[in-house]
Amino acid sequence: MAASVCSGLLGPRVLSWSRELPCAWRALHTSPVCAKNRAARVRVSKGDKPVTYEEAHAPHYIAHRKGWLSLHTGNLDGEDHAAERTVEDVFLRKFMWGTFPGCLADQLVLKRRGNQLEICAVVLRQLSPHKYYFLVGYSETLLSYFYKCPVRLHLQTVPSKVVYKYL
């Protein structure tokens, strides 16, 4: 038989499980669990939803049918700073989505080669070339100052979003 020994204002005494003392009872949470499993892919619908090549394939096809969107050596055995690279990737993606509002046609590809950071993007032809030149120079200068390394942007323009298939 399990019994607990509580020492407090009432002194040490042996009790069975009761709610008289705070140390002698257990708490039970009755809120529902919010950790639901969801697949990280686009759901199949009536065939009227346009998706890109990256969205059409599930994540388990990475390195088989599609490539990595972030290329760096942080995940190799013995390498450090994998968490910092992930945070930097999130910041870079949000920065680029904010700098080119509504102009990015697909996901960014981030490449780290030595000390250089390369950002590859497919943009829509919504702005004039002069505005794109300004935004590229602005982004490269500001990100080079933030990361203390050379940052290069490689942009490819398309007239409209590239649709791989309809789901």
From Swiss-Prot:
The UniProt keywords, alphabetically, are:
Mitochondrion, Ribonucleoprotein, Ribosomal protein, Transit peptide
UniProt keyword Transcription regulation present = no
Q: Which domain of life is it from?
A: Eukaryota
Keyword Transit peptide included in the entry's annotation: yes
Q: Which GO terms describe its molecular function?
A: RNA binding; structural constituent of ribosome
According to its UniProt entry, one GO biological process term is: mitochondrial translation
Compartment(s) of residence: Mitochondrion
Transit peptide segment: 1-35
GO terms for CC?
A: mitochondrial inner membrane; mitochondrial small ribosomal subunit; mitochondrion
State how it assembles. Answer: Component of the mitochondrial small ribosomal subunit (mt-SSU). Mature mammalian 55S mitochondrial ribosomes consist of a small (28S) and a large (39S) subunit. The 28S small subunit contains a 12S ribosomal RNA (12S mt-rRNA) and 30 different proteins. The 39S large subunit contains a 16S rRNA (16S mt-rRNA), a copy of mitochondrial valine transfer RNA (mt-tRNA(Val)), which plays an integral structural role, and 52 different proteins.
Name the family. Answer: Belongs to the universal ribosomal protein uS3 family.
Q: What is this protein called?
A: Small ribosomal subunit protein uS3m
Organism in which the protein naturally occurs: Homo sapiens (Human)
